[in-house]
Amino acid sequence: MVEKSLAELNWESLRANRKFFPSPNAWEDQVLYFLMLDRFSDGNENGYKDNEGQIVKSGTTPLFTPGDAGNAFKTPEGEHKWRESGDRWLGGTLKGLTTKMGYLKRLGVTAIWVSPIFKQVSFYDSYHGYGIQNFLDIDPHFGSREDLKKLVETAHQYGIYVILDIILNHAGNVFSYEADDTPWPGSYPVKGFNDPTGKPSIPFGPVDLNKNPEAWPNGAIWPAEFQTPATFTRKGYIRNWDNYPEYLEGDFFSLKDLYHGTGSIDDYQPSPTLLHLCEIYKFWIAYADIDGYRLDTVKHMEKGATRFFASVIHEFAQVLGKDNFYLIGEITGGRLNAYTTLEETGLDAALGISEIPDKLAYLVKGYRDPNDYFRLFRNSLLLQKESHVWFKNKVVTMFDDHDQAERGGGKARFCAGEKGEKVVLNALALNALTLGIPCIYYGSEQCFNGSGDSDRYLREAMFGGEFGSYQSRQRHFFNEENPVYRELAKILEIRQEKLTLRRGRQYLRPISGNGVDFGLPQIIGDEIRSVVPWSRLLDREEIVVALNTDYNQPRTAWVVVDYNLHQVGDRFQCIYSTDRTQVETTVVVEDRNVKCISLTVPAAGFVIYEPLKG
């Protein structure tokens, strides 16, 4: 039974005789995987490996093959249906996701970040989950509360943490204004709460189910504590997204802004609404044994509200034995904004730092100066922080995502371009083996190539359905033989084995073509085709990693290594290369006024070298 009111929650039974899954000691050791639940798995796939590694033969959807590309575009009607399907519910479920823990575990994923799962307004196709109507229930498209509990239990059995995407800033389109056009800043009268069809037929106040039985479960807003005008700011929709206080008070399009309280960050007075939100998200931690939250749209909340919420949640999680419950904030903008927001609010990590995706993706493709990416993580007067201490567990890094909010213009996954598939492994490896908590966006390991004029093209279905990647339909993509999946799994296994690759300091290394003249790799003209090496150092260990931005031929370069850690004649051994024949080969440390080694990196390839011991 789903409670209609917070007063009905039985906190004693939620915590009695339970041992909760402990937090990881270090989140920088984890590899995150972000998935949109509606687009991930419906559980009907055939020919994939189950959680134990056995081939499933009972499904109905076959595995995608290259010959299936474009099978949805054979007729104009088929193309139209494919595009339209991208804006609707497709059928991914919690049960389907539960069957893919083996797929994720074998890839090297240690934590999943799941898009919002809570009950949505019933008259919109809000498959993305950001339009909540009942904060205490799971949307029936996704399954049930028990399905969530089973998912988390299974994930924990496979050593995978579960982070839920949550919303504090707004609810779904749960009421209608009297006016048709309601731009901020207004003080707009409300017609009523919306019924299951979207009509504002329910009085705007505490719901009497005897008079309005249609309000449960699909009308108004739940739990009942939210059924008061004071829950909402009611000032109309945002037009100027960077205008203060418009971006704090305004509705997010049709999504209704919630009123959190008032006051400065040090003297913030939470509203009843914010107190209720705290209770709701405490409930989900206890009910399902959740390990972390990703907070949506932190920019649109007062920092005092964010800090109050973070404090309450961290305290509650500690009572359950989750001493490192992680709160990741979507903090758009640059590094300085991320730093100040984290320092002031008590959030644990920032996601959405604007510079990272662009500089990472285009470095790999050869169109950004390598130092533009690596200097993002350097000791900086801007941050007044020692970089390797701060960035290692304070920033979640990724290059593909579900909305590309900071990029503007058209939407495109990394592999949408002509050569993206050639070097996507390099992008995934660069993300995994540099500072920060790496996050993989679902489908990147299968070279998803969506692009277009809206977010839907970034949200193809892994299980195929009517909106698969490569303009396909009814073909799934859980292919563990895909070369990118297979090679990334090897790289992530090495990352898991090598503490230095997870926690070490990092330095972009100077290179030389002749062994005499050394300098940092840099773009000349419009592009760079070169070895790009960097070192990770922890205590007295150095591991050298390098990629090649030349798509067509191997590149060789002398690469500087730490002068004090290595002696002339010492050897580095290749522990990974996209050219398997290089693995276990060695190179010698030479003195050419600097200590250096000569590395050859395959075309569009990637290598990892460590000192040969003994």
Give the residues covered by each predicted segment.
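Active-site rim elements
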Residues: 18-19, 84-90, 267-269, 294-297, ...
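Short, well-ordered beta-strand segments enriched in hydrophobic/aromatic residues
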Residues: 542-549
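Substrate-binding/active-site clefts of carbohydrate-active enzymes
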Residues: 18, 24-30, 38-288, 309-320, ...
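Short acidic/polar active-site loop segments enriched in Thr and Asp
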Residues: 110, 291, 438
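Conserved, mostly hydrophobic/aromatic
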Residues: 35, 104, 114, 135, ...
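Active-site clefts of carbohydrate-active enzymes
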Residues: 391-417
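Active-site-proximal helices and loops of the catalytic beta/alpha 8
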Residues: 7, 152, 156, 170, ...
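C-terminal beta-strand-rich structural cap/linker in extracellular carbohydrate-active enzymes
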Residues: 31, 586-614
